[in-house]
UniProtKB/Swiss-Prot annotation:
InterPro entries: CARD, Caspase-like_dom_sf, Caspase_cys_AS, Caspase_his_AS, DEATH-like_dom_sf, Pept_C14, Pept_C14_caspase, Pept_C14_p10. The modification Phosphoserine is found at residue 302. The gene is CASP1. It comes from the Eukaryota. This is Caspase-1. The two subunits are derived from the precursor sequence by an autocatalytic mechanism. Ubiquitinated via 'Lys-11'-linked polyubiquitination. Deubiquitinated by USP8. It catalyses: Strict requirement for an Asp residue at position P1 and has a preferred cleavage sequence of Tyr-Val-Ala-Asp-|-.
Amino acid sequence: MADKVLKDKRRLFVRSVDMGTINGLLDELFEKRVLNHEEMERVRCAHSTVMDQARVLIDSVLRKGPNACQIFISNICNEDIHLAQTLGLSSGSPSGNDHTKLDSQVEVPSLPAFVENMPGPTIPDSEESTDTLKLCPPETFVKMYKEKAEEIYPIKERKDRTRLALIICNIEFDHLSTRDGAELDIAGMESLLEGLGYSVVVKRKLTAKGMESVLREFAARPEHKSSDSTFLVLMSHGILNGICGTAHSVENPDVLAYDTIFQIFNNRHCLNLKDKPKVIIIQACRGENPGELWVSDSPKASTDSWTHQPLMLQSDAIHKVHVEKDFIAFCSSTPHNVSWRHITKGSLFIAQLITCFQKYSWCCHLEGVFRKVQQSFEKPDVKAQMPTIERVSMTRYFYLFPGH
């Protein structure tokens, strides 16, 4: 019975589910009248941590019996494939009524022609090395394309699309310290984005005016018209409201405001990317505060390969009065705080970002991958920082479907 299966998976569910999946499950369960409005709000509002919300959610469903549990299991399988695999769940064969409801409410667009005869990769075992990009099997791609047709950004066929990505990385500066280890960030991000199907443009050693010029040239590229998305990766020293050019000093600021980036790529100035995901990743400090770094109630040796002596870590912070700005981006730290970079291994944020894309982008949408990165920084230690998702204006889920 579904209730027995779900009860056996309770502890693992509480430990594994993330906030995005909880919100998706709540919406589905409310729509299907498994939970009423009061029960849904009790989960969302009465408990502050993800694990607390997960406990209340699964216990509320268990109390409602086998049918409610089966609906819950089916929604997990549809909402979060990675979580379903972690829990060892399968939705089984949906009833005819479910198919009728889906087909009558959603007009599913025809699948891209290349899907029908596409040979697909196998899913790597969970214990395999995660230093390569896991590919999305055709059956998973087809399933998600059908079931989430109205919820996801469409992707273009590989043979016709011209995806572009831009990496800007400043390493050496006229007045600021050299960002040792940043070359590894460039190499890692370039390899990742190429694996995701993007042609990557890399620019180094630019002033703020130079960065703005490169961004405007990139936004004007005609290839964006036949693309379905773009990535912008900016890595440099930074302050709260912008990223530093190579000529920056306290006396003579050389800063590209983050807001300028969004103006360049908005629908008024970049029509070729209208209605397409524009992902901005920023590796830079946003202040000087080190947060909880080096603070511990009971210091002990760590087996984490990132744990090194303090002198091996550098900060990308510089001195400036902070002015709050909002932007849509995945930033390497919270406002007013530093981001850490190892002088021989590269930036901690970029390394975790690459790992999570390699491991989860085959089954998770973009914000789900970003949350996996955040979870890897959840417990402050020698590398204390908290990546932050900001200025989100996406109206659909963005799945990268690596391999397609």
